[in-house]
Amino acid sequence: MEIYGIVYSVKDPAGFGMAEYIIKYYGLEKSNVCKNAITCYVGNNFVLAGFSEDVIYFDFLDGRLPDKVSRYIVLSRHSSAKKVCSYTVHHTGNFGPEAPYGGRPRTLSIANPIVSHKLLINLSILAEEYGRIDEYEVSYEATHHGPTDVRKPLNFIEIGSTIDEWKDPVNHEIVALAVIKFLENPNHECIPVTGVGGGHYPRKHTKMAFEKNYCYGHIMAKYALQYLSPEILEEMIVKSDPVPQRIIVEKKGTRREHRRIIEQYVLNRGIVLEYI
């Protein structure tokens, strides 16, 4: 049985609210199995821990949670300049030479495609049940920000995008229940893939996740294509558990020179390329 590390920042109202719902749902009691944590609880197949640091700086997770934890799910807020109401999942890393929001430059964390796909599906179902599917966008986000130096697969699940949404107890309930439903039935089958192209909310890739059962690891948005290289593509593939054998490219907005890099890479690597 896999043990999941459910982690959050105690300073984040979204993550804190989700964690409080999980604690009350299970009637959890405090534990001392975590190191340097503000809060720590143990469930049947998970450890729930809150830390004082912001989530983008959670590179320390391997040293603070028990060794038996095999994957991480980070409960978090999501900020958007356009103030889009959203429930999102994504993986972490920096494609370019700078890392202004945590992690290291040109480094990706290990993606968690099966877990994030099931969470995405759960979010969609719950948003429908709670009557928020028209108001809130349920979507993948492209890979961005830290942490990057965690040695186990990790993904974020987030509430966006302003303090009003972060503090909304209904949002806490919806996103916490998406995690709870996963924990209670983590078995899931889907087709692991890597994504290239699209916006920060890659709607075509999200559509493929629902329609073709593709579970995405890293997604490189159109705005990051200036950093595309065979080395970055290899990082996107190998930094995923399980490792995908298919790259999905949103053709519109992906320039010819970028498509050539991808086409040569898949030819050398022997994996499938699909344009959408």
Swiss-Prot record:
User: What Gene3D superfamilies does this protein map onto?
Assistant: AF0625-like
- Please give the biological process terms from Gene Ontology that the record holds: D-amino acid catabolic process
Cite the entry's keywords alphabetically.
Answer: Hydrolase, Metal-binding, Zinc
Zinc in keyword set: yes
- What SUPFAM superfamilies does this protein's entry cite? AF0625-like (SSF142535)
Tell me which EC number(s) this protein carries. Answer: 3.1.1.96
A Gene Ontology molecular function term for this protein is: zinc ion binding
Q: Which InterPro entries match?
A: Deacylase_DtdA_archaea (IPR018033), DtdA (IPR007508)
Q: Do you know which Pfam families this protein is assigned to? A: tRNA_deacylase (PF04414)
Cofactor remark: Binds 2 Zn(2+) ions per subunit.
Q: Does the keyword Hydrolase apply?
A: yes
Catalytic reactions on record: a D-aminoacyl-tRNA + H2O = a tRNA + a D-alpha-amino acid + H(+); glycyl-tRNA(Ala) + H2O = tRNA(Ala) + glycine + H(+)
**Entry cofactors:** Zn(2+)
The subunit structure is: Monomer.
The family note in this entry says: Belongs to the DtdA deacylase family.
Summarizing the function annotation, the protein's role is:
D-aminoacyl-tRNA deacylase with broad substrate specificity. By recycling D-aminoacyl-tRNA to D-amino acids and free tRNA molecules, this enzyme counteracts the toxicity associated with the formation of D-aminoacyl-tRNA entities in vivo.
**Protein name per UniProt:** D-aminoacyl-tRNA deacylase
List the source organism: Staphylothermus marinus (strain ATCC 43588 / DSM 3639 / JCM 9404 / F1)
